């Protein structure tokens, strides 16, 4: 939104009684996750072709953009790279995309082997590194990576100029990741006051989920059931975790000084409904609307190291704009009714 050249004739938009906001930023999605032709969660062994996967990912990206998400971080699969590059060169409509291209875990090797794999991700074009330091919530969420593994991976990422994000549910996994200097914790459902204060001291970002991801899994249970740990035990765990997730978001968003950003973990079935998690933060977890929106714009841009171009409406910033009817600070559900999206001035 810098100075216009002399003689420039631009369009005028009459948005009426609307809230105009910076484009929303979702720091945790999975754009390549989709339901296949059999209406089941896609896996690499279901017979779907790469072309089918590309079409599905493109549709997910478009749905995400039209919901008001103009930038997202897909964490992550190798297919994200082609999707990112196609969007960035204007071949496909979609949100500005960053990706980890995959993830590393306790099974990825010794500290030295982890360093080598971080370098390999960088060489392949990863924008960020993702680590799994704990089990899935469907398996209890306990710590898996050792302190030495976390230290090596986070240190190598920083040496290469990459941010390092860590999937961690258990407080001990969160603490280990924070002490290792990692940049952001994903989920954090079992966060304690002690680890949250440590995050405040270290300036670590937190991306918790309020309800969309669990509700989406439960609503689409038949499409996931029987694949990997999407079993009866796993679904029971997710059902039991729903109120805990909301309580955790309530606790973390009321922890003074904690950098809480907007990340939905949107998977197959949730793309285009990302704002439901933001509405949950406001209406169910009690986060003040402006603080919730700050976490989905300015603060999220800072977490991506893109605050010099995204996240605020100001001169010389990229023109990412979203409009919803009425006053979103009085009615958070207005976020469901996005009627205007501009990304990069288009």
Predicted regions, residues:
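Divalent metal-dependent hydrolysis catalytic cores, especially in the metallo-beta-lactamase
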Residues: 54-80, 94-104, 124-136, 163, ...
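His/Asp/Glu-enriched, well-ordered alpha-helical/loop segment
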Residues: 159, 230-233, 241-328
């Amino acid at each position: 939104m810098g100075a216009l050249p002399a003689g420039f004739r631009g369009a005028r938009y009459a948005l009426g009684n609307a809230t105009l906001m910076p484009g929303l930023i979702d720091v945790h999605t999975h754009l390549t996750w989709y339901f296949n032709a059999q209406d089941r969660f896609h896996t690499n062994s279901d017979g779907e072709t790469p072309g089918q996967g590309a079409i599905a990912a493109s549709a997910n990206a478009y749905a995400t953009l039209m919901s008001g998400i103009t930038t997202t971080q897909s964490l992550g699969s190798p297919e994200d790279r082609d999707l990112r590059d196609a969007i960035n060169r204007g071949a496909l409509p979609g949100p500005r995309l960053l990706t980890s291209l995959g993830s590393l875990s306790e099974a990825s090797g010794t500290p030295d082997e982890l360093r080598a794999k971080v370098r390999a991700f960088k060489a392949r074009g990863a924008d960020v590194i993702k680590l799994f330091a704990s089990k899935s919530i469907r398996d209890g969420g306990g710590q898996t990576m050792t302190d030495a593994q976390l230290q090596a991976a986070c240190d190598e990422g920083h040496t290469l100029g990459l941010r390092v994000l860590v999937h961690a549910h258990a407080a001990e996994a969160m603490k280990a990741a924070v002490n290792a200097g990692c940049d952001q914790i994903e989920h954090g459902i079992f966060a304690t006051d002690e680890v949250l204060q440590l995050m405040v001291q270290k300036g670590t970002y937190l991306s918790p989920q309020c309800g969309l991801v669990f509700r989406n899994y439960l609503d689409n249970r038949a499409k996931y059931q029987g694949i990997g740990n999407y079993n009866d035990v796993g679904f029971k765990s997710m059902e039991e975790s729903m109120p805990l997730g909301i309580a955790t978001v309530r606790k973390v968003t009321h922890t003074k000084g904690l950098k809480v950003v907007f990340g939905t973990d949107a998977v197959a079935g949730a793309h285009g409904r990302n704002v439901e998690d933001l509405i949950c933060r406001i209406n169910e977890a009690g986060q003040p609307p402006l603080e919730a929106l700050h976490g989905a714009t300015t603060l999220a841009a800072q977490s991506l190291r893109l605050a010099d171009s995204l996240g605020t409406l100001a001169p010389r910033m990229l023109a990412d704009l979203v409009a919803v009817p009425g006053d979103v600070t009085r009615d958070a559900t207005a976020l469901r009714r996005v009627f205007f999206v501009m990304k990069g001035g288009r």
